[in-house]
């Protein structure tokens, strides 16, 4: 590994560690870690502050996965390096240095990674999430099922490409 790549991994981890749910909660005068489920993610922000704040957190958390992986595809090219960047983004979100190594569940950030890797698989994953949510009414169940199936789809729909 070269120093440029190591620096990019450190940048990705720190960028993904920004606790947008916590920051937005504070802007609304709330400590999101002490409200609702205590999670800093979009679902808890939506429940405790409102839809607009929740959507903002969702988009910002999604970008924490999308931006580093999208640019990694052009900086490093090979699947191994891109996968390490993706992992650094999700780890940064879930174990934020700014939150004493606590964080969100990684669903939105992981979905941002997925969009950067394969828009086709991301769209199918979103449709699975939406269908599961509409049938069950549970964000958590929809997230678990769609996230589990997304990596199966990556394997079967994207395997054999020169790079992700």
Language-model regions, residue ranges each:
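Helix-boundary and loop/linker segments of multi-pass membrane transporters
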Residues: 1, 43-47, 75, 102
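Membrane-helix interface segments
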Residues: 2-5, 51-53, 77-82, 105-107, ...
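Alpha-helical transmembrane segments in multi-pass membrane proteins
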Residues: 8, 12-13, 17, 21, ...
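Cytosolic, membrane-interface loops and tails of multi-pass inner-membrane proteins
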Residues: 22-54
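Interfacial segments of multi-pass membrane proteins
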Residues: 46-49, 72-75, 107-136, 148-158
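Mid-bilayer segments of alpha-helical transmembrane spans in multi-pass integral membrane proteins
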Residues: 94-98, 118
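Membrane-helix interface "capping/anchor" motifs
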Residues: 99-102, 131-145
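Conserved small/polar residues in nucleotide/adenosyl-binding loops
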Residues: 162-164
């Amino acid at each position: 590994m070269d120093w440029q790549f190591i620096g990019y991994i450190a940048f990705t981890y720190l960028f993904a560690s920004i606790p947008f749910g916590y920051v937005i909660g504070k802007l609304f005068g709330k400590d999101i870690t002490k409200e609702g489920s205590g999670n800093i993610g979009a679902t808890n922000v939506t429940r405790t502050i409102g839809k607009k704040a929740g959507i903002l957190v969702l988009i910002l958390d999604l970008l924490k996965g999308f931006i580093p992986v999208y640019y990694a595809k052009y900086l490093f090219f090979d699947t191994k390096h891109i996968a390490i960047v993706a992992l650094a983004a999700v780890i940064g979100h879930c174990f934020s240095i700014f939150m004493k190594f606590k964080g969100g569940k990684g669903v939105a950030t992981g979905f941002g990674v997925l969009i950067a890797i394969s828009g086709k698989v991301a769209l199918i994953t979103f449709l699975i999430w939406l269908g599961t949510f509409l049938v069950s009414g549970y964000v958590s169940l929809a997230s678990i099922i769609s996230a589990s199936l997304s990596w199966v789809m990556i394997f079967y729909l994207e395997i054999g490409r020169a790079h992700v």
